[in-house]
Amino acid sequence: MRKILKLKIGREDLILETGLLAKQANGAVLATYGGSTVLATVCCSDSIRENLDFVPLSVEYNEKYYAAGKIPGGFIKREGKPKDKEVLVSRLIDRPMRPLFDKRFGREIQVVPTTLSTDQMNPPDIVGMNAAFTAVFLSDIPFNGPIAAVRIAYLNDEFIVNPSFDEIQDSVLDIVVAGSLDGITMVEGGANEVSEEILLDAIDKAYAYIKQICDLQKEFIYLIGEREKLPLAYEEKVFEFKDDLRSLIYSELKDACFVRGKLNRDKAIKLVKQKAYEHFSSLEQINDENEILFYKACDDFEQEIVRKSILEDNLRTDGRTPTQIRDIIAEVDLLKRTHGSALFTRGETQALAVTTLGTSIDEQVMDDIDGDKRLNFMLHYNFPPFSVGETGRLMTGRREIGHGHLAQRSLEAMLPKKDDFPYTIRVVSEVLESNGSSSMATVCSGSMSLMAAGVPVKEQVAGIAMGLISNDDKYVILSDILGEEDHLGDMDFKVAGTKNGITGFQMDIKISNVTKQLMRDALEQARIGRMHILSIMDSVISSSRGDISVNAPKIVQLQIDIDKISLVIGSTGKTVKAITDEFEVRVQIEQDGRITLFGTDNLKMQKAKAKIESIVREPKVGEIYDGIVKKINSFGAFIELTPTKEGFLSNRSRSRDDRYGSDIRHSRYSNRNSRYGRDNRSSFSMRFPRLEEGQIVKVRISDIDKFGKIELELARD
């Protein structure tokens, strides 16, 4: 049965519809906001996998080109593998939703949001999030919903709910907030040095609308009736001999948890578990059915030890206090032939960032349903398996794309405008070691490598990952969390920014009682940590170098009148090709008359610039040129001043110097082979015997008539 509900959110109605499309799916919802429409479906498999310690959830957000009235570019006229944008939206949908599924369901779950229409004004990602959340909530799959999402922008000192693309572009804050009726579950966004209070107020603003959308979803239950949920695959079980296991390993496991060094600690913990496994195996108390339960019980003890130590003793597994940051080492210029490089090491996390400068030809062209774009800043994050001491495939996965995007957003607000710095910038982060917050290490190394490359960034940017350990009575905020603290904790909050404010952030919350005061405390602790990290980075490099790397391409720009573009190009591109060949530069001409020269030799580029300026320059009386004699006739000589300008040197003109004086003008030549017994040259050659075609001669413009014809006279050197 078709049901439709709507709610005013910002300037448009959010319309949710079910019962018309994709009725064979476990759940399907069509969501519309303005002219953007997304269909989200959810299905689960019939096969059951028992004793899983994770939710087998996959989210496959996809955009159809027909949604914007477009046909895919390229040779294959069909949508292909997911673009980075689709991967990022899939992660936005996945992260707040995953903790709300019951692991005991034991079936694979697939959520497929598909953009069917877009007005290129309202971003479809936020529409897809609410469509997906509602589809799962209305399905027969066990789910602890409802949840919803809202985007907030901050522009002209005002918060805008679900802003348009243009408003996002102009804003100083852009965040996506997801949450349930119990509280916030996810925040992600970028900013241009906003304060912590503005961020908190934006989250508050978003949450007010999130609760309204959650209530709207619950209205569907009253309209269509609550569906019977599919049964859980199994009841939660515990290891039968868990008490005996605790008595056997707890003390030894506690010691192992506080061994210094990630690899040593992991090895010590693994050894304790292995000894316990052998003990229970010898008693025939472990079998194929309860082996997973045995390891889960060991993990429960480990989590209990770590959390209890932090809550009661303010002691972390590596010996730090909650606010303490690991030792930091920062370096620049490690790689001599690159344009800029920096190494940032924080404890056992290490990121090498390399900046490469290119030309506008190197920009990434995005064929997108939201409109074609050209990106002149890219950050690529690589996380090879050796960074955690493992083997595996070298490939770019969703995690790498997501972490790279967060680091890119954190840095891009500090980059110069394209008109001021017309380079294409690519930063590559190679994570060489990882034990927590490698994306924030990427921000730090990336910021320093940009400065080392000579990119005139506005401010240094640093990042830090915050964590949370809490119980019913107390919470402890952790600065610079380890990988295990991320796994065992209640919150992962990454914050990047400058000394002036926040530029990037990402928060995932696993509990429901996170208050505004808690987030305020976390942001303040993050700010203090960020200032400490910035001070260390600034001691290595505190501002951009005055010049770009000698290994980077050089760029020279000039502006000409639009009607002069054809002069620079020349007939069939002859003129611009000659400039390219003569000066070894690459010339790019824009429709607005902006010309960009790319090359490696500054002197040749300046000469090429001067050449172009001479081509488009309007000649003036009295100017002197080194002209080329192109043609001689009986009346005088045609002199090429520039590839597009010629003047006429008459045989009646008089030089202002003595070089071509009377002895030359009145010279006579005899030619014995002449039919008339005298030289057969033109009278001009007789008067100016030193001039020959192809000769370079210095001339002065003596007159320009109303038709633009140029008269010349010989000039002094």
From Swiss-Prot:
This is Polyribonucleotide nucleotidyltransferase. Keywords: Cytoplasm, Magnesium, Metal-binding, Nucleotidyltransferase, RNA-binding, Transferase. Its EC number is 2.7.7.8. Pfam families: KH_1 (PF00013), PNPase (PF03726), RNase_PH (PF01138), RNase_PH_C (PF03725), S1 (PF00575). InterPro entries: ExoRNase_PH_dom1, ExoRNase_PH_dom2, ExoRNase_PH_dom2_sf, KH_dom, KH_dom_type_1, KH_dom_type_1_sf, NA-bd_OB-fold, PNPase. Residues 553-612 form the KH domain. Belongs to the polyribonucleotide nucleotidyltransferase family. SMART domains: KH, S1. Its main location: cytoplasm. Residues 622-715 form the S1 motif domain. Its cofactor is Mg(2+). It is found in: Cytoplasm. One of its GO terms (molecular function) is magnesium ion binding. NCBIfam families: polynuc_phos, PRK11824.1. Residues 650-681 are annotated as: Disordered. It comes from Borrelia duttonii (strain Ly). Residues 654-666 have a biased composition (Basic and acidic residues). Involved in mRNA degradation. Catalyzes the phosphorolysis of single-stranded polyribonucleotides processively in the 3'- to 5'-direction. It catalyses: RNA(n+1) + phosphate = RNA(n) + a ribonucleoside 5'-diphosphate. GO terms for biological process: mRNA catabolic process; RNA processing. Mg(2+) binds at D486, D492. HAMAP family: PNPase (MF_01595). The gene is pnp.
